[in-house]
Amino acid sequence: MSSKQEPVILGKLGSSFGIKGWLKITTYTDSVEGIFDYSPWLIKEQGEWREVKVAQWRFQGKAVVACLEGVTTRDEAQALTNCEIAVPAEQMQDLPEDEFYWRDLIGCEVINTKGYNMGTVQEIVETGSNDVLLVKANAKDGFGKAERMIPFVTDQFIQKVDLAAKQILVDWDPDF
């Protein structure tokens, strides 16, 4: 892993709200207000990250809106619509040994306990009971699978996660 990690995307700026530069916020954090625990934000404009600070935020019905420092008009806010919100990777808190950020699991090779390479984690789906790894099978998968969905349940299906090697060991039948 390089010493300079990519910023971690936490949300997206939505449409403008009102005439004073407020924006609706789409957040990917566990709790809606969790995105405001991070400062400063990075927003991506024309392929470049730039630092911004939240001046104020509030709940607006079921939505959450924010005003960024230096953004005072509706036109300025509209220019930022759909920009990604991120933070430097260094701002992310360290997790306990048995917990992982999704971004660290995506791209990991998935090997079952019999040594069969099941493919690569493409995305993770949140269900009500547990997260599920969406594993894209290798092009020449011996079982004719294009993808597999493996529940991320430690000690039952997930035997070991080795982030340094980018590998996840699973107890999962490749024919599933």
UniProtKB/Swiss-Prot annotation:
Location of the PRC barrel domain: 97-176
Family of the protein in this entry: Belongs to the RimM family.
Primary subcellular site in the record, as a coarse category: cytoplasm
Gene3D superfamilies in the record: PRC-barrel domain, RimM
Disulfide bond entries: none
Highest taxon above the source species: Bacteria
Biological process according to GO: ribosomal small subunit biogenesis; rRNA processing
Any one GO MF annotation of this record: ribosome binding
InterPro entries reported for this sequence: PRC_barrel-like_sf, PRC_RimM, RimM, RimM_N, RimM_N_sf, Transl_B-barrel_sf
Protein name: Ribosome maturation factor RimM
Subunit structure of this chain's protein: Binds ribosomal protein uS19.
Role summary: An accessory protein needed during the final step in the assembly of 30S ribosomal subunit, possibly for assembly of the head region. Essential for efficient processing of 16S rRNA. May be needed both before and after RbfA during the maturation of 16S rRNA. It has affinity for free ribosomal 30S subunits but not for 70S ribosomes.
